[in-house]
Amino acid sequence: MVFGWRKAFCTSVSSNQDKPQQHSSLHTTDPPIPTPRFRSKFGFLSNPSTPRLRSRGGSGTGCRSSASTSVTIPSLPTSPKLHCRTTSNATPRTSNSSSPKFFSNPSSPKSSSSSSSQGGGGVSLLRATLLLNKSNSSRCAICLQRVNSNQSNSTAAIFTAECSHSFHLSCVNGLEDKRCPFCSAAWNHAPKSNYPAVNNNFGSDPIRRPEIREIKTGKSLRVYNDDEPLAYSPVSLAQINTIHESDENDDVEDDDDFPGFFRDSSITSDMVPSISGNLEVKLLPESAVVETGKKKETHVVIMKLKASPSPSSITDAIKARRPSIDLVTVLDLSNGGANLQTVKHAMRSVISLLREMDRLSIVVFSTGSKRLMPLRRMTAKGRRSARRMVDALGGMETTGGVGMSVNDALKKAVKVVEDRREKNPSTSIFVLSDGQDQPEAVLKAKLNATRIPFVVSTTRFSRPEIPVHSVYIASPGALLHAPLRDAFTERIASLLNVTLHNVKLNLSLVNGSHLTEISSVYSLTGRLENFGSGSVIQVGDLFAEEEREFLVELKVPTSSSGSHQVMSVQSSIVDQMTHQPMTCPKEKRFLIPRPQSVRYVSSSIERLRNLHSMCRAVADSRRLIEREDLSGAYQVLTTARSNASHSDDSLRSLEVELNELSRIKPRNSILNRTEDKPEQLTPTSAWRAAEKLAKVAIMRKHLNRVSDMHGLENARF
């Protein structure tokens, strides 16, 4: 039944269509095309070869369909009649049209009954082609960027060809064949090559150029994560004790202790107490009363720590076993001549002290700052490249702006340490300069105290806890003499070695009233820190001859304010060989000097009071910042700054805290603004607010009803 119906339906087509079909497939020629441009635009309407199901040699069961159909589009009255050709074989024919392939009608075995759907598809394809031509007219066919002559910010010249297509003039100049890339029409009036050809990768896009310029001129520091990976040298077999195979018949077990991996270990347990005792603690002779109350007074005194140099035998042993270090050197090239040669001599000494597992980076500054070398291991190749780079340094005479360059160079040095991918156990930053940025009186006092032509001062960046050693070489030819050069090398070597690891101090009061207590301890070196009312102070690592200052605050009863107080200090360190905590056996006791009254005025006492007010202000501001009270923290810091003297060092610390607060405040205000932003007044928001108010009113009414009935449960209504 099914096959008979299909045969009857398919053979009902008029047989007159076979003759035109055969005639058109054998003798039909293409109509003349007016212009190549029209063919390129409407060539997509030629239906590609669609395989049709047709009868073979009088077979009665095949379905025959017309092979040639003409498509008439009423929306294009001036267009010529388009013919759709279909070959008799099932192999599709490739269209030579220049239109895009994704706009061509895909070949599908459809019958002639779907002509209406094909007509709708032709209209949609025509619409898509018109949109394509419209978008192509606003783009350059060479660089594929937009061509908008109406934009005011567009500075690229535009060339409009005879075929009404627009291009960038710089892109057209690079063409060898003067033909339109869209329609292949020849140009009679070709543009003159007055402008150099521009790289087509970027073109003349007015949107891209500001982004590239912004990246080039940005002031943000780059990411310095190109450090050389750590590769420790293999341990020599001579330093490892070989384990001999025991005899199977030998039943006697040796009771000898394990000698350790290093046979020639020069550090013994007898040296540990001397290492732990190399910490000098002293109290300054001035003490001041900063606050007086009805029951208690507040006294302050400064405690100073210093890591004294170790004996030569222990120092050599520590150098042999010291951990590897990541060192960033900051070199001052602002003054040429003899000062530059001195900096080069100092840098060569630093390079000679580094071992193969250490890494070195070089940053220089003059009128600007630049990183010359990333963190590189000091192998033989690394030493040669570092020395070659130091020898090629050149100085520049500058008159001003060096201070800002020093700050930028230090920021880059800290960025090198922070962005490194791999880390050595120890990290340091060396600043080698002639000390011109230091006050002359301070530099002379330090030189007279040490009697050597260079001064070393150590500070710390407390955010990443990086020690910064500033080496000021006052005399230009100081390192030309052998004794001074040896002293400088020994001093630099002591800075590379951490003398005391993880130092802790335990403070307590021996005599006096039980109401006397140590209320707070403030660190004055580096970033200010408050250790609170606890008696344990975390000092950290100390280099050789490094000094730390702490401000100790005492709460003393008013009745015993005139009596002397005794403070005991007990220190503990971590041994760098065994990594075990060790306590110094000797407890040090100090007599706290009698404080001066509030009315007493002197420069040292005034400095103590300013330091105390500054430390209290910084501690209070940080406490308020933790509570997100930025306005209160700003008010506390500004009040302390107005009360501080301009010649005091505490003013600099207050300025640092204010700058940090100013960076936090805009970010927090933006967050609060986004969180507390009121909802825009719309009918929906008004309806939502009315619903909330209605719910609140219903809840209140319900609560009022419950309160009215309260106590009437047993009223026997």
UniProtKB/Swiss-Prot annotation:
Q: Name one GO molecular function term.
A: zinc ion binding
Q: Which reaction does it catalyse?
A: S-ubiquitinyl-[E2 ubiquitin-conjugating enzyme]-L-cysteine + [acceptor protein]-L-lysine = [E2 ubiquitin-conjugating enzyme]-L-cysteine + N(6)-ubiquitinyl-[acceptor protein]-L-lysine
Q: What is its EC number?
A: 2.3.2.27
Q: Does the keyword Manganese apply?
A: no
The entry's note on the tissues where this protein occurs is: Expressed in root tips, cotyledons, leaf primordia and hypocotyls.
Q: Which InterPro entries match?
A: CLCR (IPR051266), VWF_A (IPR002035), vWFA_dom_sf (IPR036465), Znf_RING (IPR001841), Znf_RING/FYVE/PHD (IPR013083)
Question: Which segments constitute the VWFA domain?
Answer: 326-456
Q: Name one Pfam family in it.
A: WAV3_C
Query: Where do the segments described as Disordered lie?
Result: 13-120
Q: Where in the sequence does UniProt note compositional bias of the Low complexity kind?
A: 95-117
One BP term from GO:
gravitropism
Which stretches does the record call RING-type zinc fingers? 140-184
Q: Where is the composition biased (Polar residues)?
A: 13-28, 85-94
Which key words tag this protein in UniProt? Metal-binding, Transferase, Ubl conjugation pathway, Zinc, Zinc-finger
The answer to whether the entry has keyword Secreted is no
Q: Which domain of life is it from?
A: Eukaryota
Role of this protein: Probable E3 ubiquitin-protein ligase involved in the regulation of root growth. Acts as a positive regulator of root gravitropism.
Q: What is the protein named?
A: Probable E3 ubiquitin-protein ligase WAVH2
